[in-house]
Each structure stands twice: as structure tokens, then as C-alpha cells.
């Protein structure tokens, strides 16, 4: 991959570097927002050890240079090697240690995914109850631990970055202190907190996608989100459709040229005033679909709908609106 250096602004950015399980880097600003490549909008990077540079994996732009590697000096290729060579503890996190311990799952299924018989199910319910009681004392602690476990589970299922989960836990803590959780399910409130945190961190996820991974209904989660928005003193930015592009492109393995074209389409749509009141995920999917057709990638609208977490009808309607309003002549398949 060829690298392109960005023009220097004179003042270096102060970014915190996180590394995921696949070895890719994510950058977090001092204000807690996820940093994105200014060229293509991607949020995943790699580290060039020889040059001390952080490089975008999509377009190859160098977003940070002349960095010191603050990680360990040793290399490990398996989790066993990493555990043997590590000489320090885990990084500090808002997620309390009790929330990261092994718990008995709520699905009441065995290791093969089969439903437990009624006798075994009652036994598991009793064990789950005693495990919760043994770990914490007060109702406040039990509720908070349960929420932390639920957020950790959602993080693993959805692939949400840890900064978003930590922010969601902080939101839940505030809701718990104001007694907003009383009378509402922990699952719905935790999902609403995560939805809010992802938007605050500029890494929005569609609500329908989040609901697929929780026991709470879409109506419950939406109601809890509106409650948090009304009662907590937090500022949630309006979702920018551009923020959805990198994730759609990553799932469909699209080129950097398609990403740039999709971003340009959305920027033109904003200037034309046709993005207000529209679902940002649907707009992003339609823009990427148009950009793909313009670059000869003739995939179906269903592919883009699945990647964005919206319906095929939404992609089709937004596609027609963008093409008509911006006078884009899309090549016919």
C-alpha cells in the first residue's frame, strides 16, 4: 500500500492509540472522540515500525509520524505467549473488574446451543441468582454489575470499541444515580446508553442493529434513549451519514476511490439540503451504492442494505432521491 503524507497544520494532534484484537489501531482524541482519516473517513490504522508512522488502511494516508512506540518491546504471536511475556497488569478502565469475570449466561442453553430441560434450567437459574448475590451486596452494585456485564457482552457481539463501552457505562452510572433505571429493564437501559455513547463518540450504530443483540425490544430501547436524552445533561451530536461509510465499505471490501466518491456525494447532498430528516445509515448506503455503480462495481441494493443495517426499500428510495437531486447519471447494469 502506498502512503500519502498529509500537509502539516503546524500543531501536532494529541491522540491516544488503542489496538484491537486483530492488530489494527484506533485513535482517540483528548475530548474522547474517535479520530478518523481526513481523506477517506476510515477509523482503522496500522503502525509502521520502521518509520514510526500511523497509516490509514484504506487510502494509505499518514495521519501521525515520528511517534515513539510505547508498547512492549517483545513480540507475541499467540495469547499464551502474550500471557507468559507480559510483566504488567491490565490497562486502567472504567469497566470494573467484577464485570469482566465469568458469568452464567441468560440463554439457558448448553455448549452445543440446545435448550436445557426444565430441571436443569431451574438449577441454572438458582445458581445464577446465588452467583450474583455472592459477588455484590447492595442493589445499586448488583444493578451496576449487571449493566456492565450486558455492555461487555454487546461489545463482544457487535465489535464496539472499548471507549464507546466505557462511555456507555458512565452514562448508565449517571442514570442509576438519578434513579432513572427504576422500573425499567437493565438490558433496555444499557442498550440505550450504548446507542448514545456511540453517537457521542462519532461512531454511530443503527438502532435496529443494536436491538438484534439484546433481549429488549426496539420500543423499549428507544423509550429509554429519549429518557436519557431528556434527563441527563449530555450533548449528543446529530448523526452524520459520512460516519457510516467506512463501516459499510469495510464490510463490502470496497476501494478507496469508492469511499471518496461516496463522501463527495453526501457532502453535495448536505449543501443541497436533502439530508435533513433522513435516516443517516440509509443515506450512507445509497451514496456508497451510487459510488460503486460509478466505479463499475455492480452489486445489488440488498448487499448495501445488509451492510448498513437498513431495508432494501430504504436504500432504493434514498438512491432515487440522491440521483435526482444531484443530477447524477448512474450507469445502467
From Swiss-Prot:
Zn(2+) binds at residues 37, 40, 56, 59. Belongs to the TFIIB family. A zinc finger (TFIIB-type) spans 33-64. Sequence repeats lie at residues 149-232, 243-324. CDD domains: CYCLIN_TFIIB_archaea_like_rpt1, CYCLIN_TFIIB_archaea_like_rpt2. One of its GO terms (biological process) is transcription preinitiation complex assembly. This is Transcription initiation factor IIB.
Amino acid at each position: 500500500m502506498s502512503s500519502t503524507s498529509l500537509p502539516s497544520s503546524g500543531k501536532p494532534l494529541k491522540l491516544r492509540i488503542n489496538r484491537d484484537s486483530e492488530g489494527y489501531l484506533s485513535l482517540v482524541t483528548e475530548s474522547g472522540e474517535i479520530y478518523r482519516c481526513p481523506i477517506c473517513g476510515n477509523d482503522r490504522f496500522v503502525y509502521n515500525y520502521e518509520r514510526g508512522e500511523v497509516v490509514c488502511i484504506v487510502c494509505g494516508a499518514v495521519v501521525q509520524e515520528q511517534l515513539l512506540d510505547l508498547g512492549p518491546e517483545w513480540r507475541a504471536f499467540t495469547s499464551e505467549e502474550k500471557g507468559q511475556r507480559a510483566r504488567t497488569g491490565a490497562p486502567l478502565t472504567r469497566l470494573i473488574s467484577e464485570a469482566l469475570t465469568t458469568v452464567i449466561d441468560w440463554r439457558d442453553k448448553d455448549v452445543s446451543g440446545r435448550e436445557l430441560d426444565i430441571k436443569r434450567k431451574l438449577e441454572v437459574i438458582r445458581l445464577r441468582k446465588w452467583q450474583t448475590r455472592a459477588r455484590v451486596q447492595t442493589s445499586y452494585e448488583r444493578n451496576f454489575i449487571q449493566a456492565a456485564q450486558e455492555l461487555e457482552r454487546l461489545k463482544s457481539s457487535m465489535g464496539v470499541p472499548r471507549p464507546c463501552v466505557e462511555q456507555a457505562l458512565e452514562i448508565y452510572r449517571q442514570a442509576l444515580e438519578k434513579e432513572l433505571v427504576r422500573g425499567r429493564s437493565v438490558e433496555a437501559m444499557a442498550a440505550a446508553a450504548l446507542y448514545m455513547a456511540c453517537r457521542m463518540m462519532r461512531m454511530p450504530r443503527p438502532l435496529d442493529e443494536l436491538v438484534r443483540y439484546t433481549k429488549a425490544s426496539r420500543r423499549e430501547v428507544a423509550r429509554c434513549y429519549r429518557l436519557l436524552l431528556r434527563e441527563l445533561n449530555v450533548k449528543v451530536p446529530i448523526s452524520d451519514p459520512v460516519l457510516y461509510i467506512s463501516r459499510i465499505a469495510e464490510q463490502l471490501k470496497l476501494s478507496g476511490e469508492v469511499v471518496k466518491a461516496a463522501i463527495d456525494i453526501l457532502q453535495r447532498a448536505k449543501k443541497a439540503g436533502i439530508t435533513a430528516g433522513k435516516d443517516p445509515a440509509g443515506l450512507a448506503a445509497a451514496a456508497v451504492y451510487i459510488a460503486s455503480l460509478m466505479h463499475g462495481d455492480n452489486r445489488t441494493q440488498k448487499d448495501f442494505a445488509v451492510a448498513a443495517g437498513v431495508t432494501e426499500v430504504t436504500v432504493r428510495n434514498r438512491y432515487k432521491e440522491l440521483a435526482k437531486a444531484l443530477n447524477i447519471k448512474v450507469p445502467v447494469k
